[in-house]
Regions:
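Short glycine-rich or small-residue beta-strand-to-loop segments that form or flank ligand, phosphate
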Residues: 2-8, 63-67, 164-170, 278-284
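Glycine-rich phosphate/diphosphate-binding loop of Rossmann-like nucleotide-binding domains
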Residues: 4-26, 130-202, 214
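N-terminal beta-loop-helix "entrance" segment that forms/cooperates
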Residues: 30-52, 208
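Glycine-rich phosphate/nucleotide-binding loop
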Residues: 39-43, 207-307
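N-terminal glycine-rich phosphate/adenylate-binding segment common to multiple enzyme folds
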Residues: 43-135, 223
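Glycine-rich phosphate/pyrophosphate-binding loop and the adjoining helix
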Residues: 51, 124-129, 133-166, 170-174, ...
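Short, glycine-/small-residue-rich phosphate/pyrophosphate-handling segment
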Residues: 99-125, 139-144, 259-292
């Protein structure tokens, strides 16, 4: 089968090579079509996303993407957001769990974040009323709320999860977050076998850093989902172990949660675990469950051993050396 591989910016090309090497070692049979998108591509072409990239994703329906840079406070819109909206990948799935060998404050984190991926403040509707007043629109619709909440409950049921928690700020944003919460409660009635509750976003952040084990599946509007994803990654050792999947009806785009890390780009220092774990998510969805399990087990065993590991978790190994060590375990 064919799948699109987008290296992206910064460390993207290095960790994309890790994916290629692992894919070959697992004999997945995937034929990678490398396509361009990102700030580095824009510097030479004047375009953020190559025209052929969109066509390739649409044709394949499957893509694995490296990190892409986004300027802060000015410049172009996030490429991630553009791709999610272009291909209607309405659900962003981000599993978070403790790995043996990674120094953290917690030993029993095992939760999943389900983030609405297409609207909220990330819709990008903002403008200047005057030189001194900026306005942004928080767009929340019932169809999108129902779709993401139903996805969360379906995921919980399929994967043996027992509880789904809605994340909101409906005590203040009574119309927008209120609509999300009301829709969540309506959908929950169709899943009597799954416990449903809700938590205000600021209280949730406190509870996550106190007792993360009390949570199972978290479903959230776009902005809150983005924020708690990084928070939860911090609970298990950082963004180096945070994969994600952008899921639509016709298209799936997998990626690491972390950024392009330009400060270490080209130095063979990046931890490829997150994108390899995202690749494992892709393999699982493709029906290659045994290969996905082997890859996850190899990563976990390599990290747990604590010898050939990257600098972000206290080691000295480079990207290539760590990748080869994982491959040796396959």
């Amino acid at each position: 089968m064919k799948a699109v591989l987008i290296p992206g910016d910064g460390i993207g090309r290095e960790i994309a090579e890790s994916v290629r090497a692992v894919s070959a070692a697992l004999n997945t049979g995937i034929e990678w079509q490398e396509c361009e998108a990102g700030a580095e591509y824009a510097e030479v072409s004047g375009e953020l996303i190559a025209p052929g990239t969109l066509d390739a994703i649409e044709a394949c329906g499957w893509a694995l993407k490296g990190p892409t840079a986004t300027p802060i406070g000015k410049g172009f819109r996030s490429i991630n957001v553009q791709l999610r909206q272009r291909f209607a990948t309405y659900a962003n799935l981000r599993p978070v769990h403790t790995l043996s060998g990674v120094p953290t404050r917690f030993e029993n984190v095992d939760l999943v974040i389900v983030r609405e991926n297409t609207e909220d403040l990330y819709k990008g509707i903002e403008y200047m009323l005057t030189d001194d007043i900026a306005n942004g629109v928080k767009l929340i619709t019932r169809p999108a709320c129902e779709k993401i909440c139903r996805f969360a409950f379906d995921y919980a049921r399929k994967n043996g999860r027992k509880k789904v928690t809605a994340v909101h700020k409906a005590n203040i944003m009574k119309l927008t977050d209120g609509l999300f919460l009301r829709t969540f409660r309506e959908v929950a009635e169709d899943y009597p076998d799954i416990e449903a509750n809700d938590c205000i976003i600021d209280a949730l952040c406190m509870k996550l850093v106190q007792r993360p084990e009390q949570f199972d599946v978290l479903v959230a509007p776009n902005l809150y989902g983005d924020i708690i994803s990084d928070l939860c990654a911090g609970l298990v050792g950082g963004l180096g172990f945070a994969p994600s999947a952008n899921i639509g009806d016709k298209t799936r785009i997998y990626e690491a949660v972390h950024g392009s890390a330009p400060d270490i780009a080209g130095q063979d220092k990046a931890n490829p675990s997150a994108i390899l774990m995202a690749f494992a998510m892709m393999l699982n969805d493709l029906g290659m469950t045994d290969k996905a399990d082997k890859l996850n087990a190899a990563i976990q065993a390599q990290v747990a051993e604590g010898k050939v590991i990257t600098a972000d978790i206290g080691g000295t190994a480079g990207t290539k050396e760590f990748t080869q060590a994982v491959i040796a375990r396959l």
